[in-house]
């Protein structure tokens, strides 16, 4: 094996190097030079070997013109090697991320399990727990705990959380007073008819009120007149009482007749 082949044996294979023209010319020049040196050492120099060495030298010299091209190819090869290493590193990172994502997806539950758990949660929400219900009742009630003076045997409406019947009746009466027109409205009656009927009712009420006031005034006048008449009558009765008293005195004096017709 030649020295050139030994120097490049660790990096590139010999078959690949044989395809390069410069490498093959160097090998031929080395072989011809080695044969010439061996013949000189043996004191048997051969002219043919010298001619072969000259031909190899000429061929190698013509091949050296391609050296810049080989250098550019080598530089491009190094650049590609660097890119390949970077791409390999990126590929390794992507594969590691994909592996982590695969593990995370495997750790997640299945869709059927999620739907089953969701149904179970909804069923549990439909059921009201007793402690939650009691806590809500204590918020609505007047007392959060039983008072010390409370008698458990007596249950009255004052301790209920809902209002008593009297409060409900008052509330219904208040709502009826606020919505009286809507409650008294006939089913087929329109708003205009209702307004006209209410206006007529108001007029009738005003007329009735005026008539009642007139009657009250007449009654007042009669009372005034009767009061005056009654006052005169009282005066007359007072005079009659005086005359009757005198007559009684005379009767007692004369014949003791106690009958007084004015008393009946």
Swiss-Prot record:
Family according to the record: Belongs to the Mediator complex subunit 4 family.
Source organism per UniProt: Candida glabrata (strain ATCC 2001 / BCRC 20586 / JCM 3761 / NBRC 0622 / NRRL Y-65 / CBS 138) (Yeast)
TM ranges: none
Region Disordered: start-end pairs: 183-264
One of the record's GO cellular component terms: mediator complex
Compositionally biased residues, Acidic residues: 236-264
Gene Ontology biological-process entries: cellular response to heat; positive regulation of transcription elongation by RNA polymerase II; positive regulation of transcription initiation by RNA polymerase II; RNA polymerase II preinitiation complex assembly
GO MF annotations in UniProt: RNA polymerase II core promoter sequence-specific DNA binding; transcription coregulator activity
Coiled coil (residue ranges): none
Gene name as annotated: MED4
Quaternary structure (record): Component of the Mediator complex.
Residue spans of biased composition, Basic and acidic residues class: 200-225
Protein task: Component of the Mediator complex, a coactivator involved in the regulated transcription of nearly all RNA polymerase II-dependent genes. Mediator functions as a bridge to convey information from gene-specific regulatory proteins to the basal RNA polymerase II transcription machinery. Mediator is recruited to promoters by direct interactions with regulatory proteins and serves as a scaffold for the assembly of a functional preinitiation complex with RNA polymerase II and the general transcription factors.
Superkingdom of the organism of origin: Eukaryota
Record has Transcription as a keyword: yes
Location of this chain's protein in the cell: Nucleus
UniProt keyword Transcription, yes or no: yes
This protein's name: Mediator of RNA polymerase II transcription subunit 4
Sorted UniProt keywords: Activator, Nucleus, Transcription, Transcription regulation
């Amino acid at each position: 094996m030649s020295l050139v082949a030994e120097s490049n044996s660790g990096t590139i294979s010999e078959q690949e190097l044989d395809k390069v023209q410069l490498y093959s010319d160097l090998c031929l020049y080395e072989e011809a030079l080695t044969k010439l040196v061996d013949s000189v050492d043996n004191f048997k120099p051969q002219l043919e070997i010298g001619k072969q060495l000259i031909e190899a030298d000429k061929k190698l010299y013509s091949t050296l013109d391609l050296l810049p091209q080989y250098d550019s190819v080598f530089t491009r090869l190094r650049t590609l090697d660097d890119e390949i290493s970077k791409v390999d590193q990126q590929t390794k990172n992507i594969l590691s991320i994909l592996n982590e994502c695969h593990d995370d997806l495997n750790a997640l539950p299945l869709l059927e399990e999620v739907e089953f758990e969701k149904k179970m949660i909804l069923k549990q929400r439909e059921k009201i727990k007793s402690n939650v219900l009691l806590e809500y009742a204590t918020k609505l009630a007047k007392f959060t705990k039983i008072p010390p003076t409370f008698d458990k045997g007596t249950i009255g409406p004052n301790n209920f959380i809902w209002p008593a019947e009297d409060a409900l009746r008052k509330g219904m009466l208040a709502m009826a007073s606020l919505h009286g027109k809507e409650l008294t409205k006939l089913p087929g009656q329109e708003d205009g008819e209702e307004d006209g009927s209410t206006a007529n009712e108001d007029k009738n009420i005003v007329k009735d009120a005026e008539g009642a006031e007139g009657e009250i005034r007449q009654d007042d006048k009669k009372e005034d007149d009767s009061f005056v008449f009654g006052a005169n009558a009282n005066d007359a009765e007072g005079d009659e009482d005086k005359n009757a008293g005198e007559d009684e005195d005379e009767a007692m004096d004369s014949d003791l007749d106690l009958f007084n017709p004015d008393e009946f």
